[in-house]
Amino acid sequence: MHSNVSSLINDQINNELYSSYVYLDIANYYESKGLDGFANWFEIQAKEELDHALLLYKYLQNNGQKVTFEAIKKPECKFDDNMSPLQEALRHEKFITACINNIYAAANSDNDYRTMQLLDWFVKEQGEEEKNASDLVTKMELFGD
């Protein structure tokens, strides 16, 4: 594995941990509004993001690569209504998709087929995550705040 791909995967571990923070922040918002169903859904999403980070962490370890941890920034989300957390989730999923695509392109450029095989799962997962986030935005638009 080239150092560039390893570095990008290390960055993605941090991105996934940050994603977990973002979703916990959103869950906290909905919990404070008494919207337990939304809160629960985002708590589950937060756990999934942590699982993604652990998968990448183990992948680097199992391939003899150094894992480096960076500070996880605080989510800067300010929610004015019940729609804005859903829009933030969709925006964030699109960001994560772009990051995964960037790693995939680097792995492809390096003929790193093992990493590409791992990332195939992430590419599929991101398609599902973006659809779920988009569906929630659409439903909130239909039913109102």
At which residue positions do the language-model features occur?
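Iron-associated oxidoreductase/ferritin-like identity signal
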Residues: 1-145
